[in-house]
UniProtKB/Swiss-Prot annotation:
Highest taxon, organism lineage: Bacteria
InterPro entries named in the record: GTP_cyclohydrolase_FolE2, GTP_cyclohydrolase_FolE2/MptA
Record bears the keyword Transmembrane: no
Protein name as catalogued: GTP cyclohydrolase FolE2
Amino acid sequence: MTKQSLPDVAKETHSERFAPIDWVGMGAIELPVMLKQADGVYRIPARVDAKVSLDKKPSRGIHMSRLYLLSQELLTKSELSLGLLGTVTSEFLRTHEDLSTKALVQVQFEAPLVRKALKSNNQAWRSYPVITSAFNEEGQISYFVEVVVTYSSTCPASAALSRQLIQDGFKQNFSTDKPLDFDVVHSWLGTPQGIVATPHAQRSFARVKAEVGANYNYGDLIDIVEEALQTAVQGAVKREDEQEFALRNGQNLMFCEDAARRVKEALDAKADVLDYVAEFSHVESLHPHNAVSHISKGLKLRSF
């Protein structure tokens, strides 16, 4: 059987049978993408979603192979950028001009970034989950970046309760009838009896999605979130780094509501962040459940 005579049931058209479909395509296509780093461009594994609408004329299906081959051709040979994703969506529509008015491409990967230690001269690699995407509706393209930042959150309520216990311990160990000896008190504070309680803290996650321009770098969004929260988890840690981390946690006590408001304030101050939605999950060490909060700019992005 020749190629010309191979059947293609996707081309069947029966208006009474085939209703329009919002999105159809492929999810989690396995592709390597070219990611720019400070010292060069490297191939990293990624998962790609490639979709178009099926809404121009009644048809049983789209051209799946066209989406796959275009994704493979364009995304594996050029440096990954939002502008490149916009080009991909334009090609999706060009090859489906008789079928589709909208196209979407989404690339999910782990971004390796070098982070400096808090105090020492060390640095460490961190891996950040990132999703970059482009949405094209009849030539109008929107760009999005989504990141997940891991941070530490120390409970303000637990901190207050711990301070009260420390005060009680001080009262029990030092009489008001005698003058306090600075050296004795200073030494006592350095013992387990001096700091008898500590507040509960936990690893926490900020998931942030932003609408941005075509030239935006996902690393900038990660930096904004980490700077707002101040307690991003660390890689290489010496004692001076761990002490600084303890200080930052003590100076940045956070409920999940506090984390949300901090990041909202930081994002609202950035003109190149057009819209955003974010959720915060504190994986509680006190409870078997998480404490969660959700914010948005209040425009189009209201959920992920």
